């Protein structure tokens, strides 16, 4: 008969030996944007690409568009793991916004734009939990689509608010608890 009977959970802590370093799965950023000079092999259009460090493929983004600036900013602050979806820069702003919002290609069935983040788990083997689209998320159509994707992925949207007045920033609400402006 044991001398001591334990009620509940017993925790055994092992303080020696080698333990793997793991990335917190809630910190994976899903980033959608443009990079016209990007290497098409490293960053194919409308395809989730996993980036784990500054040296891993980032040089292939080029210097123009929204993705190079966004990735530099992220790596300057923390260096988080990212799933990047590069979209085509349109002839005008409206076309580019349409490309960011994306959808499904009727001919191939491939998801495009923000919709491509839904394929991140099968393609990049990670699940983005923080969704951003720098320079586009202040557009209500983009922010609304981001919230829709976030609900599906159980993620959070970090959206840019309007940069006009305090009243406009307060009234800019996507009406969902999964968004941060």
Model features per residue range: what roles?
Residues 1-181:
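Surface-exposed assembly/interface segments
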């Amino acid at each position: 008969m044991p001398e001591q009977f334990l009620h509940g959970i017993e925790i055994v802590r092992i303080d020696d030996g080698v333990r793997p370093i793991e990335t917190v799965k809630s910190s994976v950023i899903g980033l959608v944007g443009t990079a016209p000079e990007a290497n098409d092999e490293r960053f194919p259009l409308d395809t989730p690409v996993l980036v784990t460090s500054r040296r891993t493929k980032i040089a292939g983004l080029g210097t123009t568009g929204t993705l190079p600036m966004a990735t530099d900013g992220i790596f300057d602050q923390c260096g988080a793991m990212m799933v990047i979806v590069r979209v085509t820069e349109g002839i005008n702003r409206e076309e580019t916004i349409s490309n960011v919002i994306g959808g499904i290609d009727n001919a191939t069935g491939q998801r495009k734009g923000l919709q491509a983040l839904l394929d991140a788990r099968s393609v990049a083997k990670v699940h983005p939990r923080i969704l951003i689209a720098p320079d586009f998320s202040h557009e209500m159509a983009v922010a609304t689509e981001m919230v829709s994707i976030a609900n599906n992925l159980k993620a959070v949207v970090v959206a840019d608010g309007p940069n006009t007045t305090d009243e406009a920033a307060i009234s800019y609400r996507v009406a969902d608890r999964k968004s941060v402006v």
